[in-house]
């Protein structure tokens, strides 16, 4: 029986977007009666479900890749389909196994780099690997464009991300207290645009500013700068930083706000981009209107006049 083999270096209990995506793909494969197995790293920790269909490979880098490739060659059939979390190194190992391989494309990993290696070695390696895949699955039309730019002969399929509507749904009522409650959630990096949002709130007349509350969820390297900016602009009573939001609390986080806002920007020369913006879809599923910027793949997640 043909199986789907999900090969990924990121899988729960890791918290990254690729980990969550691969977990959801695996879950939906099972619900639709497909035979599926996940091959991932032992360093990801103990599988939350203790699932026998999740195989964790042990080893340091180099040895780890050899063991993964060896496992794929010995424990998969010729007609199995391998779906990889990214094109490298997951995609390379899937391709070397000799099986039919499909690679997920997210956005940032396809942006050009500045170094000699990235310009003249990585560029051609990436082009060949993407072209060699049976298919590349892009999470947005923006990411599809990046794939075609990197590898014009690659077979690209655009499938925007979705959410589980049985899980993401309204769980709490809006506060209706005369205050406009905004929320934002992401890894806190400069390109996410939280500093822009903070400055916009600061620029408002006091009679409007007093009726706004912003709650920012997530951690990251730019958090201290954002906290300092809020303090500098005398917004400590207006803006709160919640830190990491556990999956079990996400629906309440989204549902309790009036509007979800994320002002991601594209900064030339930096390898940062919003390939899709799953948080926008999650927030809308929880009954919260969203505001986003026309950057990266966000237009696929936010439809003007239809929830955003």
Predicted regions mapped to residue ranges:
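Short alpha-helical donor nucleotide-sugar binding micro-motif in glycosyltransferases
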Residues: 244-245, 252-257
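Short His-centered aromatic/hydrophobic patch
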Residues: 84-90, 105
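Carbohydrate-associated surface elements
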Residues: 142, 162
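Acidic donor-binding loop of glycosyltransferase active sites
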Residues: 255-273, 288
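Conserved donor-binding/catalytic core segment of Leloir-type glycosyltransferases
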Residues: 5-7, 174-192, 198-201, 260
């Amino acid at each position: 029986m043909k199986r789907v083999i999900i090969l990924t270096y990121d899988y729960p209990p890791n918290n990254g977007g690729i980990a969550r995506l691969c977990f959801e793909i695996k879950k939906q494969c099972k619900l639709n009666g497909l035979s599926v197995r996940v091959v991932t790293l032992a360093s990801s920790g103990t599988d939350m479900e203790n699932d026998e269909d999740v195989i964790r490979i042990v080893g340091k880098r180099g040895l780890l890749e050899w063991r993964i490739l060896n496992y794929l060659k010995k424990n998969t059939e010729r007609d199995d389909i391998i779906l990889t979390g990214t094109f490298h190194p997951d995609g390379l190992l899937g391709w070397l196994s000799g099986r039919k391989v499909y690679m997920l494309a997210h956005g940032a990993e396809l942006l050009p780099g500045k170094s000699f290696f990235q310009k003249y070695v990585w560029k051609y390696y990436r082009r060949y690997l993407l072209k060699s895949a049976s298919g590349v699955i892009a999470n947005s039309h923006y990411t599809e464009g990046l794939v075609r730019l990197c590898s014009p002969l690659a077979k690209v399929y655009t499938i925007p991300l979705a959410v589980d509507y049985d899980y993401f749904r309204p769980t709490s009522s809006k506060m209706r207290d005369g205050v406009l409650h905004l929320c934002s959630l992401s890894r806190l990096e400069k390109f996410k645009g939280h500093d822009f949002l903070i400055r916009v709130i600061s620029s408002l007349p006091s009679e409007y500013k007093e009726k706004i509350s912003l709650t920012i969820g997530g951690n990251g390297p730019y958090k201290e700068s954002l906290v300092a900016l809020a303090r500098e602009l005398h917004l400590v009573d207006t803006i709160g930083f919640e830190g990491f939001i556990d999956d079990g609390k996400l629906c309440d986080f989204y549902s309790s706000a009036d509007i979800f806002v994320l002002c991601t920007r594209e900064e030339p020369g930096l390898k940062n981009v919003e390939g899709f913006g799953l948080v926008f879809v999650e927030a809308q599923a929880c009954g919260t209107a969203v505001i986003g910027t026309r950057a990266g793949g966000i237009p696929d997640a936010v439809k003007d006049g239809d929830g955003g």
